[in-house]
C-alpha cells in the first residue's frame, strides 16, 4: 500500500484526483489532508462530497460509507483585538457583505455580528467582535471572510486579547461533559506548551488542575460539574451552557 500511495502522490495531476485515489485506497481523510493539502482537512471533506454528488456515491467499504464527517455543528466566536475603530471596522465588514452593528458591552446573542467594548483589553481602539450563531462549513466560510477584513484593517492583538469559541452543547450527555472536563484537564499541560505565556495562567482563563478526577467523575449534572470547576473565567467555561447552551473554550490567544 505504501508503494501505491507514493505512486499516487508522484502523479502530475490535480489534488482532487489524488484525494479520490487515496480515499478509494482506504487512506483516512486526516492522513490524505496531511499528504495532499498540507493539513487542510476541510478541503478534503469538500472534495469528497463533490465527488459523491457527481458520481452518485463512491465505491467504498460499507463501514467507511456509514461515517459522515460533515461539519454541521453550531458554533460562535469572540475575537478581541485593537488598533481599528469599531466604526471603521463596521464599515469594512458591511462592504464585505457581513451584517454587523456597533453596540455597548452586552451578552445578548444577535442574529448578526456585533462590535462591543471590553474593559479587559489594552491598547488603542480596542474592541470585541462577536459572531451570531454560525453553522457548519458555511459558518467557517463567513468567519474566513471576517478574518480577511480584520487583516485589511491591520488590527493587532497583545497579551490582553483572547479568542473564545462557543460550541453547541445542547445534545451533550452527562458522560460527554465529564469526558470533556477530564480530557482538557489531562491535556492542559500539552495545550499550554503551544499557547503564549499570557494564556497559561491568566485570570480570565484559569486551568482545571484544581478539580480532582474524582470530583469530575462523580458529578451528576452540568450545574454540579460547573460548580466544581468554578466561574466562567476558566479555560473551559461551563457557565456558557446556562446562558447559550454551549461550552466555551477561552484559552486561545487573540
Where are these regions (language model features)?
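Basic, amphipathic alpha-helix used for nucleic-acid engagement in HTH/winged-helix/SANT-Myb modules
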Residues: 1-15
Amino acid at each position: 500500500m505504501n508503494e501505491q500511495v507514493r505512486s499516487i502522490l508522484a502523479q502530475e495531476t490535480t489534488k482532487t484526483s489524488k484525494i479520490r485515489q487515496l480515499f478509494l485506497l482506504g487512506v483516512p481523510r486526516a492522513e490524505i489532508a496531511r499528504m495532499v493539502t498540507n493539513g487542510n482537512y476541510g478541503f478534503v471533506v469538500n472534495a469528497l462530497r463533490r465527488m459523491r454528488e457527481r458520481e452518485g456515491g463512491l465505491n467504498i467499504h460499507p463501514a467507511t460509507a456509514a461515517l459522515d464527517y460533515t461539519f454541521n455543528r453550531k458554533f460562535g466566536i469572540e475575537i478581541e483585538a485593537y488598533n481599528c475603530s469599531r466604526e471603521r471596522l463596521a464599515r469594512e465588514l458591511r462592504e464585505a457583505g457581513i451584517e454587523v452593528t456597533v453596540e455597548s458591552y452586552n451578552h445578548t446573542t444577535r442574529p448578526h455580528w456585533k462590535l462591543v467594548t471590553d474593559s479587559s483589553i489594552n491598547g488603542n481602539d480596542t474592541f470585541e467582535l462577536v459572531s451570531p450563531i454560525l453553522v457548519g462549513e458555511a459558518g467557517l466560510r463567513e468567519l474566513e471572510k471576517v478574518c480577511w477584513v480584520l487583516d485589511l484593517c491591520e488590527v493587532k492583538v497583545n497579551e490582553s486579547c483572547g479568542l473564545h469559541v462557543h460550541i453547541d452543547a445542547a445534545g451533550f450527555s452527562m458522560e460527554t461533559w465529564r469526558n470533556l472536563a477530564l480530557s482538557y484537564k489531562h491535556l492542559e499541560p500539552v495545550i499550554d506548551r503551544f499557547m503564549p505565556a499570557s494564556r497559561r495562567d491568566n485570570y480570565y482563563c484559569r486551568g482545571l488542575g484544581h478539580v480532582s478526577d474524582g470530583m469530575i467523575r462523580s458529578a451528576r449534572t452540568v450545574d454540579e460539574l460547573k460548580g466544581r470547576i468554578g466561574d466562567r473565567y476558566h479555560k473551559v467555561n461551563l457557565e456558557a451552557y446556562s446562558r447559550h447552551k454551549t461550552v466555551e473554550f477561552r484559552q486561545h490567544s487573540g
